[in-house]
Amino acid sequence: MKYHDLRDFLTLLEQQGELKRITLPVDPHLEITEIADRTLRAGGPALLFENPKGYTMPVLCNLFGTPRRVALGMGQEDVSSLREVGKLLAFLKEPEPPKGFRDLFDKLPQFKQVLNMPTKRLRGAPCQQKIIQGDDVDLNKIPIMTCWPEDAAPLITWGLTVTRGPHKERQNLGIYRQQLIGKNKLIMRWLSHRGGALDFQEWCAARPGERFPVSVALGADPATILGAVTPVPDTLSEYAFAGLLRGTKTEVVKCVSNDLEVPASAEIVLEGYIEAGEMAPEGPYGDHTGYYNEVDSFPVFTVTHITQREDAIYHSTYTGRPPDEPAVLGVALNEVFVPILQKQFPEIVDFYLPPEGCSYRLAVVTMKKQYAGHAKRVMMGVWSFLRQFMYTKFVIVCDDDVNARDWNDVIWAITTRMDPARDTVLVENTPIDYLDFASPVSGLGSKMGLDATNKWPGETQREWGRPIKKDPAVTARIDAIWDELAIFKQQ
């Protein structure tokens, strides 16, 4: 399934009962969050609020509120199919030349997909059907949500921020929250290591005193949105990956006021600039951790133009204690990560990021252990191989007889196969999420690895326990008479 734009995707969701239109007036201030949160926790549909109080523009929430909708957005039927997306990314990250004609034939589908990587630049586009500029720019006319009672101000959450460094041909797409502070002013909360912030730093060094162009796309097609949150290789642009997912080249258009290229079918595009030195205190905001984060200073984004489609839809979300939409995305993208990790570490059987671990702060790995110390090698690999896991605080490694997605299994392995002193690895002074207030220093903290594998010679001097296993023949005999026993049948 391929979608030309967000509206194509909404049509399909509605046909499948995965979209609910809300006609009752609902306030973007707190009320939409309350409804969206209850709906997501119940595994409910995406929500289109057609009459937000005080606004004429509808609000779309919970678009990716179930793993299946994430899979649908990536052009797959179910979550398990996302492993194929991961295999494609693993191939693109470290391509292997064909070993012969048969191997070449087997790889043809992957090579064919690569043809969809270049973007297609349009002269005119739906996202520029209406152009607002100058004094007419007023962000207060967009139904930007206030999600939690102590939030500082309305907050844009699903904006795809487009930037380009002074020496780069390729653009960067990143999702950074943006606090509304004026009719044409937003605070761009990007951390210093993120792509947009790096582009800005390079711009300030190369062109001191010049304004840094920025554009933000809201309501792009699902492949482009998900391309911005997927672990694409550094050599691959998010637009290129979206083309791979969609099966057609990503259509882009040059912005009205700068040379950046934005998704042609986006519902709304904000164009403007950031000036070096113009900063403002951002926050506090309720975040995906379930807490309000501290106030900090970030650059101010001045919006000079708003372009949009006729009857534009504002795409938004909320973040809070899991489950929320980022947690659901984490569950789905988990399947993408597995083949990428397995390409580098074939001994990995499964990899799981429990949603209650705030999407990435805790990982469980199961592996086919082959030698003493092997589990520690895998721990270090998880922390270092993909930048998405540089903030993972806890890595639990188990043998392949443990189900990584079953806490009963994992806790059993931890409590029976671990000695706390011997099998715990502590690493100090490592990068930690800025939002992690538990770390002693902002952005810098420790990590813990738990080796819950069976211990090999060299790791222990004791005779190691053998897991109890049932007799298969007895199990088969009891299976045959189980219904006849009627143990659970009502009298």
Curated annotation (Swiss-Prot):
It is a peripheral membrane protein. This is 3-octaprenyl-4-hydroxybenzoate carboxy-lyase. Mn(2+) binds at N172, E238. It is found in: Cell membrane. GO terms for molecular function: 3-octaprenyl-4-hydroxybenzoate carboxy-lyase activity; metal ion binding. Keywords: Cell membrane, Decarboxylase, Flavoprotein, FMN, Lyase, Manganese, Membrane, Metal-binding, Ubiquinone biosynthesis. The lineage of its organism: Bacteria, Pseudomonadati, Pseudomonadota, Gammaproteobacteria, Enterobacterales. The keyword Lyase applies. One of its GO terms (biological process) is ubiquinone biosynthetic process. Catalyzes the decarboxylation of 3-octaprenyl-4-hydroxy benzoate to 2-octaprenylphenol, an intermediate step in ubiquinone biosynthesis. One of its GO terms (cellular component) is cytosol. Homohexamer. Prenylated FMN binds at I175, Y176, R177, R189, W190, L191, R194, G195. The active site is at D287 (proton donor).
